[in-house]
Structure formats: structure tokens, C-alpha cells
């Protein structure tokens, strides 16, 4: 399993809305993530900075990257762009992190 972590952010006034939308995640999106090999996907919020820390375990980089090409993912990005900094394709602005320690 490949461990990935990345940072995103949410608008300060949208913390509750971000959580609400994820509490009601679309079943088709959750199924798509699972079918593409995503496991143990967690997103944490630092309310003081509005920074999001995401962690996911994936089966392969290719399958993970293919999620972005699905229609449901593109719809989710469009749905979220009003509360997050987004790229021109509506994907959230994110920064992939490098692992510097792991204790199995």
C-alpha cells in the first residue's frame, strides 16, 4: 500500500460547510474512490489556519490518478470550488507532502 499525504485549504468562513458536504459525501464518489484503490482516506482541519491535511492509502499511483478523469470527481470538484482555492480545472489547490518518518 502506498501512503500519500497532502495539504489543501478551505475558506475560513466555510469550515462547517466543508464538514457538512463531506458528512454527506456522494455514495457514487465514495464508490469511485474505493474502486480506484483508495483506503483509509482521512481529512483533518486546522481551524486556526483553515489548512486541511489529507491522508490516503492507495494501491497504485495510476489508479489514484485516474480518479481525476472520472465524471463524478469532476462534478465534486465543481461542487467544492466555491469554498476552496481551486485550479482552473476546479481541482483543489494542493501540495503533496514527502514522508520523513514511518513507524510500522
UniProtKB/Swiss-Prot annotation:
Keywords: Carbohydrate metabolism, Cytoplasm, Isomerase, Rhamnose metabolism. The keyword Metal-binding does not apply. Pfam families: rhaM (PF05336). InterPro entries: Dimeric_a/b-barrel (IPR011008), L-rhamnose_mutarotase (IPR013448), Rham/fucose_mutarotase (IPR008000). GO terms for biological process: rhamnose catabolic process. Its EC number is 5.1.3.32. GO terms for molecular function: L-rhamnose mutarotase activity. Belongs to the rhamnose mutarotase family. PANTHER family: L-RHAMNOSE MUTAROTASE. This is L-rhamnose mutarotase. It comes from Tolumonas auensis (strain DSM 9187 / NBRC 110442 / TA 4).
